[in-house]
């Protein structure tokens, strides 16, 4: 197994090497500059739009689309993923997560805009959209192979990456540590719960997301703010460690082995993308289903997802780890945040975190089931959707039986493969994005 893990780690380093990181962040920087720092100027308007009355064609409300996207993004990456980034990349990794998120907001805006601009209807009358459609309809038929590549990668991510294995693996690990629940039992129960919802399609998924996502996010935010408040004297040193570690690296201390600037950048950006999915091309699949006729407005709503996910939730996770000192402890990344919670709240803290993670991960599974389904439909049509759903549930049930380190590495690899065609499309269609934006904001 060690040789297998080493092979995938080398492949991961290749996929997430300098070229993809430069393309990922560079696309966000380019769009940020061309759109005139849109993520700063129009963020308040974006939040107001979330709660406006929906007008236009679509399957679900704009809030439902955002909730579904947040359901998919707010997952184990916000808890275990942040801990992994800090333990391997040092406190400086948090800074690079922020940078990836800031520029990623412009990327997410562009994705949401194009999703509405180039969406279509399938044979069942449901809305279909996302990168595979704006590649095909925006860039032309000759780019169909790139659209197919994205769709294949999307199915792989849903079935073998973010959508199933990483989420279930983390859930079972936390349930076993907190309640002694056997991973086999937990995996089967999760699979059964997921199956009762995803066979109802996007309407069921969005309804569940609208109810669960605000509650789980608020509960987790309150808990992490409490931890930081109880260690307020350590907040300033923690922030200093974040900024110094981002540019000079972090020396070894306690159980922490040390990290270079390169490690901080690589782990911070990779985990940031895993968490908020900006540039990955997943969120526009949900955005396409929104009831709106205005691409720019849905783009603005979409970019709030990155702000909520990384700038708020991931930051609170990272700072709670740093102020408590748990990030320097020896042990697995899956228990770092749990130790932080139990250190403040006692045994109840472990239960609180476990319940938050179960909700985070379960809603992520639901959101990604829809993403993978739309990609699968693009490849094979609507007739075989139930075959995909059945196999998805099977993979959910399998997730608790695999080694965590290997699962995360595989997830990173397929994430990178999914991001590449989407980023190419965003750059190629940037004139459309800029033109649509200028026309809207002139009104």
Predicted region positions:
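Transmembrane helix-loop junctions in multi-pass membrane proteins
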Residues: 3, 20, 35-38, 77-82, ...
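Helix-loop-helix module between adjacent transmembrane segments
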Residues: 27, 31-32, 100-125, 132, ...
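Alpha-helical membrane segments and immediately flanking helix-loop junctions
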Residues: 56-88, 114-138, 149-152, 156, ...
């Amino acid at each position: 197994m060690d040789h297998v893990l080493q092979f995938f780690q080398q492949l991961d380093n290749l996929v997430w090497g300098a070229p993809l990181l430069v393309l990922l962040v560079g696309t966000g920087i380019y769009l940020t500059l061309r759109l005139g720092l849109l993520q700063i100027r129009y963020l308040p308007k974006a939040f107001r739009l979330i709660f406006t009355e929906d007008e236009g064609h679509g399957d679900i409300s704009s809030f439902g689309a955002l909730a579904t996207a947040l359901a998919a993004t707010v997952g184990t990456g916000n808890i275990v993923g942040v801990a992994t980034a800090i333990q391997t990349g040092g406190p400086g990794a948090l800074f690079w997560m922020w940078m990836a998120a800031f520029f990623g907001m412009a990327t997410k805006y562009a994705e949401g805009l194009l999703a509405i601009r180039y969406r279509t209807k399938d044979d069942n009358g449901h809305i279909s959209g996302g990168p595979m459609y704006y590649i095909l309809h925006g860039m032309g038929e000759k780019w169909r192979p790139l659209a197919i590549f994205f769709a294949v990668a999307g199915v792989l991510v849903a079935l073998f990456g973010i959508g199933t294995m990483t989420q279930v693996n983390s859930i079972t690990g936390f349930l076993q540590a907190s309640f002694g629940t056997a991973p086999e039992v937990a995996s089967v129960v999760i699979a059964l719960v997921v199956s009762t919802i995803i066979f109802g399609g996007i309407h069921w998924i969005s309804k569940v997301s609208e109810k669960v996502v605000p509650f789980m996010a608020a509960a987790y935010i309150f808990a992490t703010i409490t931890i930081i408040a109880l260690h307020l004297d350590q907040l300033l040193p923690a922030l200093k460690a974040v900024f110094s570690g981002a540019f000079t690296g972090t020396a070894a201390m306690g159980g922490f082995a040390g990290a270079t600037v390169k490690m901080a950048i690589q782990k911070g950006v990779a985990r940031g993308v895993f968490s908020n999915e900006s540039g990955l091309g997943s969120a526009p699949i949900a955005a396409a289903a929104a009831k709106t006729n205005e691409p720019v407005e849905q783009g603005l709503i979409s970019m709030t997802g990155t702000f909520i996910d990384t700038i708020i939730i991931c930051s609170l996770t990272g700072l709670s780890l740093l102020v408590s000192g748990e990030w320097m402890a020896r042990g697995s990344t899956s228990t770092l945040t749990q130790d932080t919670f139990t250190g403040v709240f006692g045994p109840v803290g472990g239960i609180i975190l476990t319940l938050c993670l179960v909700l985070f991960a379960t809603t992520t599974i639901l959101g990604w089931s829809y993403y993978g389904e739309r990609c699968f439909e693009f490849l094979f049509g609507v007739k075989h959707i139930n075959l995909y759903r059945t196999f998805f549930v099977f993979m959910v049930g399998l997730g608790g039986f695999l080694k965590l380190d290997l699962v995360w590495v595989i997830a990173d690899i397929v994430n990178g493969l999914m991001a590449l065609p989407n980023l190419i499309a965003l750059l190629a269609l940037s004139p459309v994005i800029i033109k649509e934006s200028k026309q809207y904001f002139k009104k």
